[in-house]
Amino acid sequence: MSDLAIVIMAAGLGSRFGGTKQLVDVGPNGEVFFDFAIADSIAAGADRVVLIVRREFADTVEEHVRSMHGDIDLHLVCQDETNAPTRKKPWGTAHAILAAKGAVDRPFIVVNADDYYGVESYQLVADELREAGESTVVLAAFELCRTLPNEGSVSRGVCAADGQVLTKLVETHGIERNTDGIIVSADPPGTLTDLTPVSMNMWGFRVSIFDHLERMWAEFLDAHRDTEKTEFLLPSVVAELMGAGLLEVKVVPVASDWIGVTNPADLDPARAALADLRS
């Protein structure tokens, strides 16, 4: 019997991609991104898979997962049917995790459904999470150079840490490598290095996080019930809890290559990279 679940956030709209990129095949055997999350987390000891989806494609997701992974312990949670006013845009990553509360009764790893994190990352986070106390959160930190696209700029959560303890997570926009080969950012403006640690939204939590999320979601909803785009976001929640002294975040360095797609033009490079890694 294992002591770990994987929670995969697959309800985002992917507006810049122009479609449901969570269901686009990227792997050499017809895998979508979250197939690798399922396989790699199971290899790290997870025995429950929780997929957070929208109702409109829940059946399609379940059919795909069963065809690829067989009779695993699979739970689908529809974020758009969970404790929130109806609107087109999902209510954010922290709300997605709260929506999964009824399906999670053990420590769990959280990932995006449309990112590839590498086999090693799941084992590293799982190992740290098993040793973590109730008030400790685990955050995988990737080397910035391993997360940059060949073209264009991106946003990343830049980690500042004291040893392995996170002190600040700064959402940094307009990150790109300039013509001199230097990594620069637009907001806040600055220079970064290849080895700058960044968050790609891979977390490890214990179930005690749900008590905090329920309280903070109620407060958030009181203030933003009628908004169409304001989101209840996981990094903001974690930062608030850190500031209040209610939890500590342990940063786990990961040397794996991250692979993702933002625009349709990113698909072919992602497929080529995954073919090299997973064939």
Please provide the spans of the model-predicted regions.
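Conserved N-terminal catalytic core of the sugar/cofactor nucleotidyltransferase
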Residues: 1-8, 28-110, 117, 122-124, ...
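Active-site metal-binding loops of divalent metal-dependent hydrolases
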Residues: 13, 114-115, 144
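A short acidic, often aromatic-flanked loop/helix-cap motif at beta-alpha or helix-coil junctions
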Residues: 81-86, 146-147, 175-177, 258-259
